[in-house]
Amino acid sequence: MAFPIRRPTDIEAAPHSRGVLRAIERNERGRAPHIVALGGGTGLPAVLEGLAELAAEKSEKDPYAVTGIVTVTDDGGSSGFLRQQLGILPPGDARNCLLALIDRDSRFRELLQHRLNEGPGVVGHPVGNLLLAALAQQTGDFSRAIEQLGSMIGSRGRVLPSTLEDVRLRAELESGKTVNGETEIVGDVSPVRRLSLHPSPRPLPETLAALVNADGIVIRPGSLYTSVLPNLLIEGVAATIHGVNAVRIYVANLMTEPGETEHYTLDDHLRVIRSHTGFDLFDYILVNRRPIDDDAAQLYAARGSEPVVAEKLLRCAGRAQVVECDLAIEWGGVKIRHHPRSLARAIRALVAAGRTTPLTVELKT
């Protein structure tokens, strides 16, 4: 069944609503809301950075207030090399998430992102990847390695791997071919028909616990087949998200991705998530309404990427309410990204609004 989009009105136009949101932003236990975001790549760090900065502004020091659940299927670049040579899980996405959770002016940001420019076997590797590799070898536990590095650099939240098992992506393509590994999937020109994980992994128990105890769960923007779905395909993750009482938010992508989602609309993204998980997972779908700069859009178009269109009638949204906000930002006229602070404010407001109360306010960011 198709559900029409319901358009809210303006939160800033209703002075009383601001006090209400502030009052309900802390739950019955008097603590800050616990928000869990799932993903990988560049989208998850943007969500975590905004949430952590907003929590710091509110003087919220709860280590469970912001949690990132990161994919472990990357098999390219430095992460892929260390994974193959050392037998560890890929460290790159976890590194980026940890750095998003520390102070913007921390000296560790530049240090852990620094790529070594000489030396046999280490050229091109970020220092943070090597530190995570060393800690993983020392502790014998990749999640413990992430925790220890986070403690060293002053992380303002948690980063958890979705699983500790050595898992690979497998895609059945529309051409009939089957390809294995994230790099091969992105590099093939044929669209993906079906994605799976091999071998079928068990979730990290702490990951499921974080979802169960969350006040808000965010599926962050990013590569549909290589960043969004890998977490949701792990045994028990989608079912847990479907069954919890948390507010569940899907952040729609700004642009399509060459090699994965050419010409996909928002409804196409939602259809793929539903068909792979078997659930309508979301209470809210957060959509950018800010027009994309023409020059930036042309640069993306030259690479085969275009804005993700949000149809007026979404057939695969279930009962989710679509909320439109100004979320996009152009960096140097080249990269189109979600603005971390605007995104965090919208997420916090939706979590505060709850899942059973229909929104009558628009989120002005």
Question: Predicted segment positions?
Answer:
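A short, charged helix-loop
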Residues: R193-S196
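Electropositive, gly/pro-rich neighborhoods at or near active sites that engage anionic ligands
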Residues: A2-I5, K61-Y64, V70-P191, A344-A353, ...
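Glycine-rich phosphate/diphosphate-binding loops and the adjacent beta-loop-alpha structural elements
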Residues: L111-D141, G222-L229, M255-T261, I292, ...
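Glycine-rich beta-strand-to-loop/alpha-helix junction loops that act as flexible
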Residues: L38-T42, R220-S223
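Conserved phosphate- and dinucleotide-binding cores of soluble alpha/beta proteins
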Residues: I5-R31, A52-A55, D62-L89, G187-V189, ...
